[in-house]
Amino acid sequence: VRIKGAHHPPLGPGRLPWTQNLFATRVAAHVFLGAVKGGEPPPDVYFSGHYHVPGDSYDAWPTRALALPSWQLPTSFAYRLGADRPLPVGGVILTCDRGRYEVAKHFYEWQIRKYGAL
């Protein structure tokens, strides 16, 4: 199983719910076609983080792209950039065995709560 990863993906995501999986599909196409054009074997799986928007291209391209969620809840900086609510946090476990792989997603939603005075 060929795996390629980067903190900064080659493309930016849409931040709207209906564009999140399209982001992963665009990344899969970019990585697959870039490898083919460069005469390299394309990776089976490509993963990236940075944008904190989870997504999965599944089998849209021969390279499967996984856009990973954040590992922490939004900070004040994220809200200055326009975040309106926390996206899922978590990660992915990729298990490889004899040329096959399985993806186990561990994403968690956090409820927004109001602060209360004691």
Tell where the protein language model's regions lie, with residue ranges:
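A short C-terminal boundary segment appended to hydrolase-like catalytic domains
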Residues: 96-118
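Conserved beta-sheet core of the metallophosphoesterase superfamily
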Residues: 2, 9-104
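A short, sequence-level motif marking secondary-structure junctions
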Residues: 7-12, 108-112
